């Protein structure tokens, strides 16, 4: 699997009009300071990931104004990495995959008639639930921003929640559901995907166990521009 059909690759998330800024510092998980038009202002970071290779002092980021009354004046959407753009919004992949799956644009999942978001199962809520004559399917979508020497890696910080989701997907397979985890790499320079066993060995082990139990795993890289984010291609998974 190294390509997408034209329908899937043409579905996109349109970004708001963006302003170039300079990242100053990360205040906490969800707030960073940026310099824009000569002023230093707080900006919402839409991800709990560390993203140290993207959000560091002096790096170029792209932001949009927040509505009045919010705690932060801006929202960070993209960060520059060498000559490419990286989307840092951890919820964008969920929106993109819901849009793609709702249009039946990925052949692996085109046989389901019903597509829902945020459906509960056990002690978890999975991002997408598919239902139809083909059966029932849970999908968990993971946002990936870290790429090291061409290898996309997840997570970039220990993720107990991520391991829990994998365990629940495994349990769902045992109860007759189809289950899948889709890693969306929000940049286009990844050649393959691997779990980040050094940062989170528990997640890596849990992922291997999930695959052995029948959970499907896919990884897709994105084409990211100042205007849109869209799926670009499948990349191989290496455990």
Curated annotation (Swiss-Prot):
It holds the Pfam family SfsA_N. This is Sugar fermentation stimulation protein homolog. CDD domains: SfsA-like_bacterial. Belongs to the SfsA family. HAMAP family: SfsA (MF_00095). The gene is sfsA. One of its GO terms (molecular function) is DNA binding. InterPro entries: SfsA (IPR005224), SfsA_C (IPR040452), SfsA_N (IPR041465). It comes from Desulforamulus reducens (strain ATCC BAA-1160 / DSM 100696 / MI-1) (Desulfotomaculum reducens).
